[in-house]
């Protein structure tokens, strides 16, 4: 069974919800495969995720990992899916006990050392997330003031992958 989290995509200034699904396929060669009409930044996310995860001591899956960005017929551009993909993978492999992971929208590029880098288009993505009915969002700390301009959605500004894990596990995030 796959783990699903959500992010947002932009077409111009209009946003739409993206479902990020992570599944491991046992018995196949170790690799991360990302599908769903992503650009080069999306395709490179696997390398950033692996580096960020190992910085915090998480294990890479021993089998093939498939990450799907849906809807599959709409283009996904940018590196802001990294955080959602990493959290979906950690939850799928039962390395974190994420509570309510499916209720959040995740936006953020991961650095190789696990920091969450700022992104462009956060205001439009949070606006679209609220319009889609989402109540919780995680964005890079540097984008928090921009994201908080949108009412009706609770937004957390985080600095690292580990802070996101703590939030999802119900541990205090300072």
Model segments located where?
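Peripheral, non-AAA+ core regions of ATP-driven protein-machinery
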Residues: 1-174
């Amino acid at each position: 069974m796959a783990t699903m989290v959500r992010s947002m995509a932009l077409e111009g200034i209009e946003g739409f919800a993206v479902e990020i699904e992570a599944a491991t396929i046992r018995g196949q060669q170790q690799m991360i495969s990302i599908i769903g009409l992503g650009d080069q930044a999306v395709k490179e996310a696997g390398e950033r995720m692996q580096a960020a995860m190992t910085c915090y001591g998480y294990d890479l899956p021993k089998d093939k990992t498939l990450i799907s960005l849906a809807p599959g017929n709409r283009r996904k551009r940018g590196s802001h899916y990294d955080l959602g993909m990493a959290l979906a993978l950690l939850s799928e492999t039962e390395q974190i006990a994420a509570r309510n992971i499916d209720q959040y929208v995740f936006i953020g590029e991961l650095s190789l050392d696990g920091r969450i880098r700022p992104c462009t288009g956060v205001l439009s993505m949070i606006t679209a997330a609220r319009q889609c009915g989402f109540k919780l969002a995680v964005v890079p700390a540097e984008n928090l003031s921009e994201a908080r301009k949108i009412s009706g959605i609770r937004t957390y500004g985080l600095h690292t992958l580990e802070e996101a894990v703590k939030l999802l596990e119900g541990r205090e995030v300072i």
